Amino acid sequence: MAELTIRPEEIRDALENFVQSYKPDAASREEVGTVTLAGDGIAKVEGLPSAMANELLKFEDGTLGLALNLEEREIGCVVLGEFSGIEEGQPVSRTGEVLSVAVGEGYLGRVVDPLGNPIDGLGEIETSGRRALELQAPTVMQRKSVHEPMETGYKAVDAMTPIGRGQRQLIIGDRQTGKTALAVDTIINQRDNWRTGDPNKQVRCIYVAIGQKGSTIASVRGALEENGALEYTTIVAAPASDPAGFKYLAPYTGSAIGQQWMYEGKHVLIIFDDLSKQADAYRAVSLLLRRPPGREAYPGDVFYLHSRLLERCAKLSDAEGAGSMTGLPIVETKANDVSAFIPTNVISITDGQCFLESDLFNAGQRPALNVGISVSRVGGSAQHKAMKQVSGRLRVDLAQFRELEAFAAFGSDLDAASKSQLERGQRMVELLKQNQYQPMSTEDQVVSVWAGTTGKMDEVPVADIRRFEKELLEYLHRQEQGLMTSIREGGKMSDDTLQAVAEAIAAFKKQFETSDGKLLGEDAPSAAK
């Protein structure tokens, strides 16, 4: 019988090999907290000492929360979703992630919630990645000056407060003054650029609806679809029925989707409708989290809430891809008071504002643009050269007309020059009126404004101005298509071009019949005397 020998070296080697190759079963080390308070869309959580600011927390029913307050003993978080199932004592776990949203071309033509989930019933969205909501805006060296036009299709805006790609232009005014209409028409006006298929002309649009009625959001979507603009537009919807947390986050979601396209070298237009309601939602969340209130009960960082959002709109340098994101934030005022807290904050952040006035709106002037306090600080360098050429005197002429109109209201006798100026001003005011969902092309605006400011419409009755303009532009597109194309594609108009436009207008006037049955051509000799 063979003798059993035990070799200590073999046993030692076997033990060493086993120890070195041993891998324990993956033991999950997870911090688990407890809900101590829940309600009104917020929750207080104890027992997560390593949680980060703006980290996502997961509740027992799968609902997510966003950590906003990191206090000594507990965390104050805003619940992202339905909060009725969250109760005291329930466990809460960390996710180790910050809030992000899926991005990509699949968002075009879709309606999504503030977390990027589709809510239009058209199935899942094909995405190309994810982007964090809280990202730094482009630095100074990554930017370039605004120099390309972003036309709204409104003569009053494009002539007097022009907007450039990468600019932040505030639309401000009381409720029911046409703010959303101006923004939606700007989206519709990008339709012809989109259909060219040229990436340098195409503009992807994002409409962020914050605290709007569901019916209003549906009507905006319907208007975009009816006018062929939904195919290049994304709607981020946080209706009035959504929790305050969603209304606070919606603009950042839209901005993240747009930034992805901007950094890919594409052009984006984003509309925030409206930031007053976002500030109200943030105030509600902050007060529920016991943050100290400041002016008008807003928290101390409400300026930063909007500045870090709007600073993301930029025109990138060529080295960064030359993309752009143009922002049109909307702010609602009370009784035309632009000196309130939120309006003054956003005015100081943006590059200009279009002030829409309820008195002008009710008087039938639409868009109801108050020329006196509306301004574009950087858009002048981006304005189409032909438009800049013809609109130079428009603002001054209108301001003088308003002053003269107020003076004439006293019934004073006016000299012939003042009467002439008053009559031309009335025609210019009528000329600047436009119907909703009917934005005008650049060449049509240029011809229309030039004809008005140079007195080519002085003999047209005020009641016939808009019909004269419509029929004149139809005549020019029919008879002088080459001339209209040269205005659109060229820069500053030459003397020959201006002469050709003047001759075409003169030829049309001879065949235009006024509402009282007269031909303008018949009155021309007497008007010249």
Curated annotation (Swiss-Prot):
What are the subcellular locations of this protein?
A: Cell membrane
List the residues marked with site Required for activity: 374
Q: Which PROSITE patterns match?
A: ATPASE_ALPHA_BETA
**Stretch forming the signal peptide:** none
Q: What's a Pfam family this protein contains?
A: ATP-synt_ab_C
Q: Would you tell me the Gene Ontology cellular component terms?
A: plasma membrane; proton-transporting ATP synthase complex
Q: Which domain of life is it from?
A: Bacteria
Query: What biological-process GO terms show up in the record?
Result: proton motive force-driven ATP synthesis
Q: Where does ATP bind?
A: 173-180
Answer yes or no on keyword Membrane: yes
- Name the chemical reaction catalysed here: ATP + H2O + 4 H(+)(in) = ADP + phosphate + 5 H(+)(out)
GO-annotated molecular function: ADP binding; ATP binding; proton-transporting ATP synthase activity, rotational mechanism
Q: Which InterPro entries match?
A: ATP_synth_asu-like_sf, ATP_synth_asu_C, ATP_synth_asu_C_sf, ATP_synth_F1_a_nt-bd_dom, ATP_synth_F1_asu, ATPase_a/bsu_AS, ATPase_F1/V1/A1_a/bsu_N, ATPase_F1/V1/A1_a/bsu_N_sf
Q: What class of enzyme is it?
A: translocase
Tell me how this protein sits in the membrane.
Peripheral membrane protein
Indicate where this protein is primarily found: membrane
Quote the Gene3D superfamilies the UniProt record gives: 2.40.30.20, ATP synthase alpha/beta chain, C-terminal domain, P-loop containing nucleotide triphosphate hydrolases
UniProtKB keywords: ATP synthesis, ATP-binding, Cell membrane, CF(1), Hydrogen ion transport, Ion transport, Membrane, Nucleotide-binding, Translocase, Transport
EC number(s) stated in the UniProt entry for this protein: 7.1.2.2
Please give the subunit comment from the record: F-type ATPases have 2 components, CF(1) - the catalytic core - and CF(0) - the membrane proton channel. CF(1) has five subunits: alpha(3), beta(3), gamma(1), delta(1), epsilon(1). CF(0) has three main subunits: a(1), b(2) and c(9-12). The alpha and beta chains form an alternating ring which encloses part of the gamma chain. CF(1) is attached to CF(0) by a central stalk formed by the gamma and epsilon chains, while a peripheral stalk is formed by the delta and b chains.
Instruction: Indicate the family of this protein.
Output: Belongs to the ATPase alpha/beta chains family.
Entry-linked PANTHER family: ATP SYNTHASE SUBUNIT ALPHA, MITOCHONDRIAL
Question: What does it do?
Answer: Produces ATP from ADP in the presence of a proton gradient across the membrane. The alpha chain is a regulatory subunit.
Query: Could you tell me what this protein is called?
Result: ATP synthase subunit alpha
- Annotated organism of origin: Streptomyces coelicolor (strain ATCC BAA-471 / A3(2) / M145)
Q: Which gene encodes it?
A: atpA
